[in-house]
Amino acid sequence: MIFVFGDSHAGKFGADKRFTLCGPPAPTAYGLANEKNKSESLFLLRQMLHEVEQNDIILFVLGEIDCRVHVFRQHVLTGKSYAEICAGIITRYGRILLAVRNDNNCEIAVLDVPPAVKQGNEYEYDFYGSRNERASIAEEFNSQLETFCKENGVCFVKLHPHISDEWGWLKEEYSVDDVHVSEEVVPIVVQELQKCFPNL
């Protein structure tokens, strides 16, 4: 069984019977480490873990909201570089990832962040990066997340290179709206997962 825990991008796996979905609305990679947050993501993760059995796989799908909204905002407010801010997020996110794997005798995999999307500042955030800025943030985040996964023996699922154009933006054929990837990405993710788990 593959449990998918994540944000709204995780919903694309629902049509495939190999996947079981779990996750709150709009969770972030940063917020997953908070005992108390609006999305109750850590609480819901712990609830899901009661259903996970030995040798099950948990696929984490988090970070898109961090990269689209929060990293740029913190960059403006604090003057810190994208790299510094991403490092802080991944430290927190990574701590939970390793705890889940080590404490529950299960396998974990981490999906990278999808490419920058068309959506502008429709929610009127006080600070919101351009599409190029958001593409740079996603690239930095994915680079650091991949390094973390390699250093800790975690399966890193690379979707971004398959569905991004030369500017690091989401290709039209993989977009279902101005924010989300389409179901067309699921076979790619399965193919990438099989590199880590050949019997999948």
Q: Over which residues does each language-model region extend?
A:
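Surface-exposed, active-site-proximal loop segments in enzymatic domains
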Residues: 68-82, 119-129, 170-174
